[in-house]
């Protein structure tokens, strides 16, 4: 249970980040930038507090933790979960069954696309058998490894066009998945010209041109606690902020 001072600190940190997002968005004429509060390893009590303050977009990195939290917070009907962690293909069925799952941001290859699509179609078949007609496409983002670091997940920049084409043209994928945009994790030691963010913008421009998709319909998820402001400057439509809102992480009970 959080004490009064902890609650005040959380709300103050959240409002500070929210204000900074608004200021930088206005400065560079960016509209409707989503602030995703990354709540991994943090208790659901903290999520409830921010939800009660009107926040809706929350990010989780671990499938089992997301499943547990989504069940515990199932009455929060307007919550929008962003999955931003590594996807194990054998857990795609569990992931796609999460209530109020808004987007999976970390799709990096065709195998994951196909697994997600198959899981969704199986879920749809089960829903139809149970007379549950609450079926809709799942938003997905293609994760691009713009920095080329071996420690990071994501497809190569030159591979993302082919993955988007597969999402849009494969029968199973186009019937169950909605291509929302691109995601990257910038190098924390990036130079001021932000080559990783520029690379993702270049990928977006190429996809728009090659596949005749309107530029403004392709979202960009880039920017975290340490670099969300330059990310917005470069065109991010969604920033993922965790420790700057919730405080440092405790990974001792990581799921």
Swiss-Prot record:
Gene Ontology biological process terms from the UniProt entry: vitamin B6 metabolic process
Give one GO term, molecular function aspect. pyridoxal phosphate binding
Q: Which key words are in the record?
A: Pyridoxal phosphate
- Any Pfam family hit: Ala_racemase_N
| Cellular-component GO terms for this entry | cytoplasm
**Residue positions, PTM N6-(pyridoxal phosphate)lysine:** 40
Q: SUPFAM superfamilies, alphabetically?
A: PLP-binding barrel
Function noted in UniProt = Pyridoxal 5'-phosphate (PLP)-binding protein, which may be involved in intracellular homeostatic regulation of pyridoxal 5'-phosphate (PLP), the active form of vitamin B6.
PANTHER family attached to this UniProt entry = PROLINE SYNTHETASE CO-TRANSCRIBED BACTERIAL HOMOLOG PROTEIN (PTHR10146), PYRIDOXAL PHOSPHATE HOMEOSTASIS PROTEIN (PTHR10146:SF14)
UniProt record similarity statement: Belongs to the pyridoxal phosphate-binding protein YggS/PROSC family.
Query: Which protein are we looking at?
Result: Pyridoxal phosphate homeostasis protein
> What organism does this protein naturally occur in?
Dictyostelium discoideum (Social amoeba)
